[in-house]
A protein has these predicted regions:
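Short, solvent-exposed loop/turn segments enriched in Ser/Thr/Gly
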Residues: 29, 37-43, 107-108, 120-127, ...
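Short, acidic/polar linear motifs in exposed loop/turn regions
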Residues: 50-52, 117, 196-200, 214, ...
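Short acidic, flexible loop segments centered on an aromatic residue
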Residues: 57-86, 195-214
């Protein structure tokens, strides 16, 4: 019997979306794959960080992070309409697809995207699922030798990372529809309602700058952000030590990320959206 523990690695700060009491048995680097159509290849490094041998299996599926109106993010996998348009899960070949790593051992996994000449320019994607479980071949023999009958329980860890395939002229941008504000004594929560523009997801950073009535900046903060389709994203600004009054908040949307190389980003000009708030 196998029990699965699932770690979706989303494009959020620190790339951690779920905290579980168990720890992953293998480490993955990098945690995002970018494939260009002039090479069709990319790779990751998998390392067995546990004290026992690990069986590794790699699979592909389509999915993307989506949000509700409150900005809560979850993975969405059951969208066949978008899968038919944007997915490359059936075009990806992995070498090797199955392997066993001894404790401390590392292995390069190469991902090849087969050419898609009949599809328009833009960014396509899939999720690479790296599943691992401990190899313990002697357990069943030991139970039989001792005359024991029981169910062998194996824990399978699944780590889910994005794979992006860039074909031809990829473009992106944002259409900001509205910014909602929720303010209490300690913080101001901004919820950005926006739709990605162009033929590629918007991967980048939201920078929030807050100015008082004299034009002096009194707060600034930033968070990574991604818009695959129409989304809501949250960003929080501390306000507990600020005086009452009116302020201006400038929200800048940049296609820059510290954890993503500039050559992998689909670039767009900085976009700025300003709102007036009262504390």
């Amino acid at each position: 019997m196998k029990t699965k523990i699932y770690f979706p690695l989303l494009l959020v700060p620190l790339l951690i979306c779920i905290m579980l009491p168990a720890q992953a048995q293998v480490s993955i680097a990098p945690t995002m794959l970018f494939v260009q159509d002039n090479t069709n290849m990319s790779e990751i490094y998998v390392t067995n960080t546990s004290s026992v041998a690990q069986e590794i299996n790699i699979s592909l599926r389509f999915g993307f992070p989506a949000s509700n109106e409150e900005g809560t993010i979850s993975m969405r996998y059951e969208d066949e309409e978008k899968r038919a348009i944007y997915s490359v899960d059936e075009q990806v070949r992995v070498f090797p697809r199955r392997l066993v790593l001894q404790p401390g051992q590392s292995q390069t996994l190469r991902f090849q995207v087969m050419p898609m000449a009949n599809r328009p320019d833009g960014m396509y994607w899939a999720r690479a699922v790296i599943a691992s479980r401990a190899v313990s071949p002697d357990v069943d023999d030991l139970m039989l030798a001792q005359g024991e009958v029981g169910a062998r329980v194996g824990v399978v860890f699944e780590q889910d990372i994005p794979l992006f395939y860039r074909k031809g002229n990829a473009t992106t941008g944002l259409i900001v529809h509205q910014v909602f504000t929720d303010i209490d004594q300690e913080r101001m929560v901004l919820r950005v309602h926006a739709t990605r523009d162009g033929n590629s997801p918007f991967l980048g950073t939201i920078v929030a700058e807050m100015f008082d009535s004299s034009g002096a900046m009194v707060q600034n903060t930033a968070r990574s952000a991604f818009f695959y389709f129409e989304e809501h994203r949250r960003i929080e600004i501390p306000v507990e030590d600020m005086e009452s009054g009116r302020y201006r908040v400038d929200l800048h949307f940049d296609t820059q990320r510290r954890d993503i190389s500039a050559r992998d980003m689909v670039q767009a000009p900085r976009q700025t959206h300003s709102i007036e708030v009262e504390i």
